[in-house]
Curated annotation (Swiss-Prot):
Descriptive protein name: E3 ubiquitin-protein ligase HACE1
Provenance organism: Xenopus laevis (African clawed frog)
Single GO biological process annotation from the record: Golgi organization
Pathway note: Protein modification; protein ubiquitination
Active site: 911
Taxon lineage: Eukaryota, Metazoa, Chordata, Craniata, Vertebrata
InterPro entries, A to Z: Ankyrin_rpt, Ankyrin_rpt-contain_sf, E3_ubiq-protein_ligase, HECT_dom, Hect_E3_ubiquitin_ligase
Keywords linked to the UniProt accession: ANK repeat, Cell cycle, Cytoplasm, Endoplasmic reticulum, Golgi apparatus, Membrane, Repeat, Transferase, Ubl conjugation pathway
């Protein structure tokens, strides 16, 4: 009876408290009963359960073998923690990772739990398996208040973890200022290295912690490298930590020159160097000028080394251009606005010759420098004392003299350039002071290149030795071939420096005049080595006057190389340009309707940001799931075909029936000019992303896109008979024919004939033998240009949003057609040569042999359908099938094996240009199924 009453009481208590009222005898079961109560700090319930239980409070459970005391310390359940300690829980018990309850309390900032654990003699010096103590955990998380309490119990504040790192290391790395101060006040070793030799200052700099680095330096921390020689400054530059770098230089001024010299280290990321120098330059104008001077010094040194034939061209060229790029970046973003000089941008007029090599804005900046105040190296004083020019002016002066020298000798003897061999000599590497003295000497004593030549011809090499010349180049060597690349690289550097002083889009008059002055030599360079154009003469793309001087040489270069140059500059600064199907986000997807693709595409493209379209294109057809490269290609293909839809009246078919040009009567469509702009955007966007369009234009329209004047022969595309008549006029004497032609023509405008003058007063000016050529040109311009000028302007407005005029002029009208529309014919042999096989197929398999036999038998139109079925495009890019694009770049046409079942059709994955071809039992079945797929399944996408 008594036992029954006890059970009834337990039942009642359990129901009232909604929990068990006694622990199971099994520790494993009991601990999981207690654990949620401990986590919730339900100490009364825990006490009640433990009171009548034999449960082992030190029982370790779970994967990491922790006790309930660990759980209480980790969760901050201080009441349960005290209860467990009173019942004999071990405060120093370590889990499988070596952590004690004190470690967990410290890591999570449980102050009360820490205090109670210390009261019960928790050992603060115990390390976990990684060597971390409680003090490490407090330092990692910056728990300074708790650290103050704990250090009183610590015998060694510099206890090391497995990597030799102390609490000070990790506090500095994480930027906890008050924690660092507490540790230092408690006697932490400020210069203690870890196992790799890294000090606390090293750790602070590795994560750009300027505040903790400042504290360490103020407390006397030494500037020490690790065992691999990596310094705190190296770490600051590698991470782009400008503020921390500034702190280091304030305490160790000698590091400034080290930083400047680091611009030559090609292993350091250029953008990180820029970031650091940008921050430093914005601190004060003195600092800004000091950085410019330092960079100019290093650039000048590298430039002169590059002009030395004994140096490594590749290494010195890269180093010079890298330094100059950094210099220009710093120049543009300084705290002051040094771009206040008199240098006006090129506006198409020739610059007066008296402005050649006039000291301009960069030099004006250098004149502000007080050398003594800036404490620069001794050789800098030479520049200031002997010349008004900035350091870079010495390099530009040398460049000018070399070019003048070569021009003079080429003029005297164009076949033999050995006379100047003595001037273009191997030089030993010089330091900056040697170069400074040498060029002051060369400028002051020689005066000009004639003096240098005279002394060289006389055998007097004393003046040559003054600038480090050792021995002449071997006779018979082509001096221009040896020096053209080097001088061209310095010219590129000169252009960059001139450009950084100008408003964007304007070319420095000084550089314009420089190129004009050395025109013949530069043309000689590119004639000998055309690759120089693509490597160093990028300025041609930014100045029409200069481009016109070299255009005949540029267009003589291989089409492939010009294409590479075109895309190199077109895509500069655009990341991941091959992934044109990649959307920035869901809102950037172009959602279009297949049944109204032209109008719906026009709406979404006009609403889209131009820069985002350059970064990536994603297209989805309304009601279809598919997305990816194949869908993008199909969109361009169908959309370009819709442009010539007669319903829009935008383009008319030419006489040959295969090409199109703008319709002079397109105004029947009220929105025609906006549509022309849209057409221009689509073609520009397609060219930008290397997508082909399914449309061919007349040669005259390609000329309009390129800015090339049309001629009477272009009239043949729209009116062959009229073109023959114009040809006849030019070929025959019309003096006595009595044609009575005037400089006006009659034109049909919507059924009404109107007389249109070809020039002012043209109706009263007769066409004669003397002016007939002018007449033919004017009437050609009327038919081919004036009649469609608004349409051309609208198209170019859209096209130039993606393709700059300066870049597209690299090509002629035939090449532009190749770029836009690809090859009109499909070469089956090239197709076979550039096809891959997968999923079980090999080139020699019977099914593959049948497939290619069927392709040979297909009509040209069916081959186009097959190409479109697999790749999403009906055109082959320039260069053939080897250049077909896939979802992530070049992707060969691929045929994959699929198990055969009756009536199974071939399928495709257009994003990867893959034809999934069943293993058909006969050639006849293969051909039948393939044609069904081509004629019935070419459009529409679902997810593969």
């Amino acid at each position: 009876m008594e036992r029954a009453m006890e059970q009834l009481n337990r039942l009642t208590r359990s129901l009232r408290r909604a929990r068990t009222v006694e622990l199971p005898e099994d520790n494993e079961t009991a601990v999981y009963t207690l654990m949620p109560m401990v986590m919730a700090d339900q100490h009364r319930s825990v006490l009640e359960l433990l009171s009548n239980s034999k449960f082992d409070v030190n029982y370790a459970f779970g994967r990491v073998k922790r006790s309930l005391l660990h759980i209480a310390a980790n969760c901050g359940s201080v009441e349960c923690l005290v209860l467990l300690l009173k019942r004999g829980a071990d405060p120093n018990y370590q889990d499988i990772s070596g952590c004690t309850p004190l470690h967990l309390a410290a890591r999570n900032g449980q102050k009360k739990c820490m205090s109670k654990l210390l009261e019960y003699n928790a050992d603060v010096n115990i390390c976990n398996n990684e060597g971390l103590t409680a003090i490490h955990w407090l330092a990692v998380n910056g728990r300074t208040e708790l650290l103050h309490d704990l250090v009183q119990h610590v015998t060694n504040v510099d206890v090391e973890d497995a990597m030799g790192q102390t609490a000070l290391h990790v506090a500095c790395q994480n930027g906890h200022k008050t924690t660092v101060l507490c540790l230092l006040d408690s006697g932490a070793d400020i210069n203690r290295p870890n196992v790799s030799g890294a000090t606390p200052l090293y750790f602070a700099c590795s994560h750009g912690q300027r505040d903790t680095a400042q504290i360490l330096l103020l407390r006397g921390a030494k500037y020490l490298p690790d065992k691999n020689g990596v310094t705190p400054l190296d770490l600051c530059v590698q991470g782009g930590y400008g503020e921390t770098c500034d702190i280091l230089i304030q305490h160790h001024p000698r590091l400034f020159q080290t930083l400047i010299q680091m611009t030559q280290n090609e292993e350091l990321r250029e953008n990180m160097l820029r970031q650091v120098l940008e921050h430093l330059s914005q601190q004060s104008e003195v600092q800004y000028l000091k950085i410019l001077t330092g960079l100019a010094e290093v650039a000048t040194t590298n430039g002169h080394k590059l002009l030395s034939i004994s140096s490594s061209y590749e290494a010195q060229m890269k180093s010079l251009l890298r330094i100059v790029r950094i210099f220009c970046h710093v120049f543009r973003i300084g705290p002051s606005s040094p771009n206040n000089g008199n240098d006006m941008g090129y506006n198409g007029n020739k610059t007066p010759r008296n402005q050649v090599f006039k000291v301009r804005n960069v030099s004006d900046v250098f004149r502000k420098i007080n050398i003594k105040e800036m404490n620069l190296p001794k050789h800098t004083l030479i520049y200031q004392a002997t010349s008004e020019q900035d350091p870079l002016e010495l390099l530009w002066h040398s460049l000018d003299e070399w070019l003048v020298l070569i021009a003079t000798e080429l003029t005297k003897n164009k076949r033999d350039s050995s006379n100047i061999a003595c001037i273009l000599l191997k030089q030993s590497p010089l330091d900056q002071q040697d170069i400074s003295l040498a060029h002051q000497s060369a400028i002051g004593e020689s005066g000009n290149h004639d003096h240098l030549l005279a002394s060289t011809r006389a055998g007097d090499l004393e003046s040559c030795s003054a600038i480090g010349i050792q021995e002449p180049v071997a006779d018979g060597q082509d001096v221009i071939s040896m020096t053209a690349n080097r001088l061209s690289a310095v010219i590129q550097a000169f252009y960059m420096c001139c450009s950084c002083q100008m408003p964007q889009g304007m070319t420095s008059p000084r550089f314009i005049e420089f190129v004009c002055k050395h025109d013949e030599v530069l043309k000689c360079f590119v004639t000998r080595n055309p690759k120089i154009i693509f490597d160093h003469f990028h300025f041609l793309l930014e100045c029409p006057e200069l481009m016109s001087r070299f255009m005949h040489i540029i267009k003589a270069q291989p089409f492939k190389e010009r294409c590479e140059w075109f895309y190199e500059h077109l895509l500069a600064g655009q990341p991941d340009t091959d992934m044109v199907h990649r959307p920035v986000n869901e809102n950037d997807i172009l959602l279009v309707h297949r049944d109204s693709i032209f109008r719906s595409s026009c709406e979404v493209v006009f609403k889209s940001n131009c820069e985002k379209l350059k970064q990536g294109i994603a297209v989805r057809f309304h009601g279809e799931e598919g997305m990816g490269q194949g869908v993008v290609r199909e969109w361009f293909d169908i959309l370009s075909s819709e442009m010539i839809n007669p319903d829009y009246a935008l383009f008319t078919q030419s006489a040959d029936g295969t090409t199109f040009q703008p319709n002079s009567n397109s105004s029947v469509n009220p929105d025609h000019l906006n549509y022309f702009r849209f057409a221009g955007e689509i073609l520009g966007l397609a060219l930008y992303h290397r997508q082909l369009v399914n449309i061919y234009f007349t040669r005259s329209f390609y000329k309009h896109i390129l800015g090339i004047p049309v001629n009477y022969q272009d009239v043949a595309s729209i009116d062959p008979e009229y073109a023959k008549n114009l040809q006849w006029i030019l070929d025959n004497d019309i003096s006595d024919l009595g044609l009575e032609l005037t400089f006006s023509v009659e034109t049909d405008v919507f059924g009404a004939m109107e007389e249109v003058p070809l020039k002012p007063g043209g109706a009263s000016i007769l066409v004669t033998q003397e002016n007939k050529a002018e007449y033919v040109q004017l009437v050609t311009e009327l038919r081919m240009t004036r009649a469609i000028q608004p349409q051309i302007n609208g198209f170019l407005q859209g096209f130039h949003m993606f393709i700059p005029p300066s870049l597209i002029q690299l090509f002629d009208e035939y090449e532009l057609e190749l770029l836009l529309s690809g090859m009109p014919e499909i070469d089956v042999n090239d197709w076979m040569k550039n096809t891959e096989y997968t999923s079980g197929y090999e080139r020699d398999d019977q099914v593959i042999q049948w497939f290619w036999e069927v392709v040979q038998e297909l009509t040209q139109e069916e081959r186009v359908l097959l190409l479109q079925f697999v790749t999403g495009s009906s055109r082959v890019p320039h260069g053939g099938f080897a250049y077909i694009m896939g979802g992530s770049g070049l992707q060969n046409f691929t045929i994959a094996a699929v198990a055969y079942t009756a009536n199974l059709l071939p399928t495709s994955s257009t994003c990867i240009n893959m034809l999934k071809l069943p293993e058909y039992p006969s050639k006849e079945i293969l051909k039948d199924r393939l044609l069904v797929a081509l004629h019935c399944g070419s459009y529409g996408y679902t997810m593969a």
